[in-house]
Amino acid sequence: MRHYEVMVILDPDLEERAVSPLIENFLSVVREGNGKVEKVDTWGRRRLSYEIKKKPEGIYSVIDLQAEPAVVKELDRQMNLNESVLRTKVLRPETH
């Protein structure tokens, strides 16, 4: 398994209480693929440096996880299919 960091920017029109269940829904893909979610850090509403899908701000969330590459690819695919997700970025942090 590899370590990944996933940043997701959600639609600012979502209610605060709807953010956590939405992220948990995405993370079920990781858990079903025998991956491990290490940390979920929701930063809240932040102003974007440029508009994405005509939205000037978004709800940022950073997820640290360990999973196989195919599981992370499926997670990214599921997130991109959801209309509440403005942008995703999957990174593999460097380990020294």
Curated annotation (Swiss-Prot):
It holds the Pfam family Ribosomal_S6. GO terms for cellular component: cytoplasm; ribonucleoprotein complex; ribosome. Disulfide bonds: none annotated. InterPro entries: Ribosomal_bS6, Ribosomal_bS6_CS, Ribosomal_bS6_sf, Ribosomal_S6_plastid/chlpt, Transl_elong_EF1B/ribsomal_bS6. Keywords: Ribonucleoprotein, Ribosomal protein, RNA-binding, rRNA-binding. One of its GO terms (biological process) is translation. Belongs to the bacterial ribosomal protein bS6 family. This is Small ribosomal subunit protein bS6. It comes from Streptomyces avermitilis (strain ATCC 31267 / DSM 46492 / JCM 5070 / NBRC 14893 / NCIMB 12804 / NRRL 8165 / MA-4680). The lineage of its organism: Bacteria, Bacillati, Actinomycetota, Actinomycetes, Kitasatosporales. The gene is rpsF.
